[in-house]
Design a protein with these regions (language model features):
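Short, Lys/Arg-enriched N-terminal segment that forms or immediately precedes the first helix
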Residues: 121-134
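Short, small/polar residue-rich loop motifs at catalytic or cofactor-binding pockets
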Residues: 28-29, 44-46
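Cyclic-nucleotide recognition modules
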Residues: 63-121
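Short beta-strand segments in beta-sandwich/barrel cores
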Residues: 32, 55-60, 93-94
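Cyclic nucleotide-binding regulatory module and flanking cytosolic helices
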Residues: 1-33
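Phosphate-/nucleic-acid-contacting segments
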Residues: 136-137, 143-181
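Glycine- and acidic-residue-biased ligand/ion/polar-headgroup-sensing regions
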Residues: 39, 46-64
């Protein structure tokens, strides 16, 4: 059964504000569905917000992976000059809006600010994940990554995965062998 746009958006907003549909009825209208094929890049417009319904994206600083974003997570394009690229690693379905559209709603309905602030906090949590990963000892990195991303090896090459984990390709190969993956 296909879920409606409102049901899909609800999965992102209900934990923040269970009454969002009644209190901010205009919110769903500013989100547009966008689909991406593997290898396709997100439009890198400052302040864009993507809610990932299906699929997985990679966030890269130049060519270095800094984050993987899964269905149920959001991606915010920084509102300043940056060197990030956001690339679909699988077939992806998103809902996209802009900071400008959210500001327009916020001008007459300040409840949008709370939603946006909460999504911004979640972005920081996503970024903190990689910092935590890099601070772990090498033996603990394997479980830390594959508990969150059990299927990641299906989407990224071995060398990229090692780079994301901050370990050598040889060590990753040994960890994979030891874990019988």
């Amino acid at each position: 059964m296909n879920k409606s746009k409102e049901d899909l958006l609800d999965s992102f907003f209900r934990d923040i504000n269970p009454q969002w549909q009644a209190e901010i009825p205009e919110l769903s209208a500013v989100f547009e569905e966008e689909r991406f094929s593997p290898g396709e890049r997100l439009i890198n417009d400052w302040g864009e917000l993507y809610l990932i319904v299906d699929g997985i994206f990679g966030k890269y600083e130049k060519t270095c992976p800094v984050r993987y974003a899964l269905a149920g997570e959001s991606l915010m394009i920084p509102n300043h000059k940056h060197r990030y690229q956001f690339i679909a690693l699988s077939d992806c379905r998103t809902y996209r809006t802009s900071l400008r559209q959210l500001e327009e709603i916020n001008a007459h309905n300040p409840k949008v600010f709370y939603l946006y602030a909460n999504l911004t906090d979640k972005q920081q949590t996503y970024l903190d994940y990689r910092h935590k990963l890099l601070s772990l000892n090498n033996q603990d990195k394997f479980d830390f990554v594959f508990n969150k991303y059990p299927d990641l090896r299906s989407y990224v090459k071995h060398n990229e995965l090692a780079q994301f984990m901050g370990i050598s390709s040889e060590l990753l190969r040994r960890l994979l062998r030891d874990h019988d993956c």
